[in-house]
Amino acid sequence: MKIGVFIPIGNNGWLISSNAPQYMPSFELNKAIVQQAEHYQFDFALSMIKLRGFGGKTEFWDHNLESFTLMAGLAAVTSRIKIYATAATLTLPPAIVARMASTIDSISNGRFGLNVVTGWQKPEYEQMGLWPGDEYFSRRYDYLSEYVEVLQDFWGTGQSDFNGEFFQMDDCRVSPQPQTPIKLICAAQSDAGMAFSAKYADYNFCFGKGVNTPTAFAPTAARLQKAAEQAGREVSSYVLFMIIADETDELARAKWESYKAGADTEALAWLTEQSGKDTQSGADTNVRQMADPTSAVNINMGTLVGSYANVAKMMDDIATVPGTEGILLTFDDFLSGIENFGQHIQPLMNSRADIVDTLPPAAREVA
């Protein structure tokens, strides 16, 4: 089972709460996080892109770094962990993204991959005059399909004459090409998004569901497998979970209850408002799940709350879901969370036993 870290490119990570750790994003923080993750043999690090936050008293996600430049820096200070940046495809022409990807591929010596997003939060793009109109909600995966086909031209031959509805290339060239194939990922849950991932992506990210219900996302993984079979490809799921762990279940639960009690209601109201803007894509989109009031304080990603031993067991349960190749992790406190994961959770996981055996001595004292 592969393990990755969803690094906090925006302020306060993924907890919309005044009772959660409050911090600004910085290169130094993310460098420490990714180097620590590499030390504990995490397989990859991913950063999102966010161009406008939710506001509220915590100013949630009002302060964000940029994904490609951050990951280029992190590629230069790591040696093994895979590095994924996110392209907000409405803001960056595919020829520029192809060249930036080739550059980070060079910096990382072949460790770079790309996450592509269509854009769901209208104010992010409207503020720059880049929103193409609300009809885009129903056409966004048509747009993204052309975008990726252009990328594939550049990474395959270094040249494109693509002529589509959204993109037209005229002997456009990108060189040098990547030294290794660029892995492409998407985070899709709608039917249109699943069809896109099945046709174009190497991996598809999905949300975990609920609190301490590690296999509840299984129907989503099954939908991807069905779509991939129809497309004649193999595409695996990577699932997003937040870990809130401590020495005992009671201590971990107390932290979770405190975070919920401090929920930033103004920021959450903004999220709910934005989730209703897309009336075209149906009820199964990521943003619909993010805004569900059940656990909106951490945008409704799956949450594992408990002792180190119980979290390890739930992580192993995730690994049993067919079609699941990896887990993307966030933490309430990233530095202490990764340390506790490496020292107290990973050594107890059957699904990471092969990794524990390869850790440096200082990282497997409890194994």
Swiss-Prot record:
<comment type="function">
    <text>The FMN-N(5)-oxide reacts spontaneously with NADH to produce FMN. Requires the flavin reductase RutF to regenerate FMN in vivo.</text>
</comment>
<dbReference type="Pfam" id="PF00296">
    <property type="entry name" value="Bac_luciferase"/>
</dbReference>
<dbReference type="InterPro" id="IPR019914">
    <property type="entry name" value="Pyrimidine_monooxygenase_RutA"/>
</dbReference>
<comment type="similarity">
    <text>Belongs to the NtaA/SnaA/DszA monooxygenase family. RutA subfamily.</text>
</comment>
<dbReference type="GO" id="GO:0046306">
    <property type="term" value="P:alkanesulfonate catabolic process"/>
</dbReference>
<dbReference type="GO" id="GO:0052614">
    <property type="term" value="F:uracil oxygenase activity"/>
</dbReference>
<feature type="binding site">
    <location>
        <begin position="49"/>
        <end position="50"/>
    </location>
    <ligand>
        <name>FMN</name>
    </ligand>
</feature>
<protein>
    <recommendedName>
        <fullName>Pyrimidine monooxygenase RutA</fullName>
        <ecNumber>1.14.99.46</ecNumber>
    </recommendedName>
</protein>
<feature type="binding site">
    <location>
        <position position="115"/>
    </location>
    <ligand>
        <name>FMN</name>
    </ligand>
</feature>
<dbReference type="InterPro" id="IPR011251">
    <property type="entry name" value="Luciferase-like_dom"/>
</dbReference>
<feature type="binding site">
    <location>
        <begin position="140"/>
        <end position="141"/>
    </location>
    <ligand>
        <name>FMN</name>
    </ligand>
</feature>
<keyword id="KW-0285">Flavoprotein</keyword>
<keyword id="KW-0521">NADP</keyword>
<dbReference type="GO" id="GO:0008726">
    <property type="term" value="F:alkanesulfonate monooxygenase activity"/>
</dbReference>
<feature type="binding site">
    <location>
        <position position="124"/>
    </location>
    <ligand>
        <name>FMN</name>
    </ligand>
</feature>
<dbReference type="InterPro" id="IPR050172">
    <property type="entry name" value="SsuD_RutA_monooxygenase"/>
</dbReference>
<keyword id="KW-0288">FMN</keyword>
<dbReference type="InterPro" id="IPR036661">
    <property type="entry name" value="Luciferase-like_sf"/>
</dbReference>
<feature type="binding site">
    <location>
        <position position="190"/>
    </location>
    <ligand>
        <name>FMN</name>
    </ligand>
</feature>
<keyword id="KW-0560">Oxidoreductase</keyword>
<dbReference type="GO" id="GO:0019740">
    <property type="term" value="P:nitrogen utilization"/>
</dbReference>
<dbReference type="GO" id="GO:0006212">
    <property type="term" value="P:uracil catabolic process"/>
</dbReference>
<keyword id="KW-0503">Monooxygenase</keyword>
